[in-house]
Amino acid sequence: MDNNMEIDAARSPEPHHLSPTTDPGSIPTLDGWIESLMTCKQLAEEDVRRLCDRAREVLQEESNVQPVKCPVTVCGDIHGQFHDLMELFRIGGPNPDTNYLFMGDYVDRGYYSVETVTLLVCLKIRYPQRITILRGNHESRQITQVYGFYDECLRKYGNANVWKYFTDLFDYLPLTALIENQIFCLHGGLSPSIDTLDNIRSLDRIQEVPHEGPMCDLLWSDPDDRCGWGISPRGAGYTFGQDISEAFNHNNGLTLVARAHQLVMEGYNWSQDRNVVTIFSAPNYCYRCGNQAAIMEIDEHLKYTFLQFDPCPRAGEPMVSRRTPDYFL
């Protein structure tokens, strides 16, 4: 984000704080935290530490290919756009009434990465069977030091402790999810090192995102119009063609790969003869791209519906008319 886009509206109110003896796993504590976070108030540093400790216990029990049941609503990138996350919940339904699967990239670029990721982690602990949060390529120590989350933590807390608590927690996020053994969900895309879901299950995910290899590819790769594997212009992961996604889906008994990671102007985009769908849930990305956002509702019969939404106008934040972006951010 450009420095000159930092505005008074992004500065945080006093953090919500509960007593040091409060159990971070208790329902009253979590409900208090969630209530505060829903008004875009950050938690106190010590509460974030205890929250992340509790979340690690929950996440380390989950699989690299986390099973998810229908009905569920699948969401793409959020990127710290907290008020647009509130709009997403308004459109899709509140927790725990709606089951949610988020496919990563909660932080960086938007004004409110701290509040966004804290709320999603709180909801995960409070309703562990109702919400699934996967790892994106921005849930990384290196990436967050460049694209905003690190600097936001310094600005809002005066030190890097909260950044460290969350980036340590990111190592425990599941890499992928599998809806009813049919719809495969992940942040980025496929890997030449991975032929089967069992290949993914055997990975050691508790680490910083590597610069190369299968774990990197799952978070960084993109579908492409060209067949086969290609070198990614991102500098990490690969591009993969329709032949690759068709073979992967066929070999693993899948009907669809759902992924995020790329800005699409209508919020969702089918590709590769409907073997792959891209979902992007940050409207007017970076407060200037003019795109719609979307979420994918999947009912108990595995029928899906896309709900598109625009950003909420907010005082103090720049607005743009919709336009085609000059490049993918």
Swiss-Prot record:
Binding locations of Mn(2+) 2: 105, 137, 187, 261
GO terms for MF: metal ion binding; protein serine/threonine phosphatase activity
PTM-bearing positions, type Leucine methyl ester: 329
Cofactor(s) this protein requires: Mn(2+)
Disulphide bridges: none
Catalytic machinery residues: 138
Protein's job: Involved in hyphal morphogenesis.
Family stated for the protein in its record: Belongs to the PPP phosphatase family. PP-2A subfamily.
Stated name of the protein: Serine/threonine-protein phosphatase PP2A catalytic subunit
Organism: Emericella nidulans (strain FGSC A4 / ATCC 38163 / CBS 112.46 / NRRL 194 / M139) (Aspergillus nidulans)
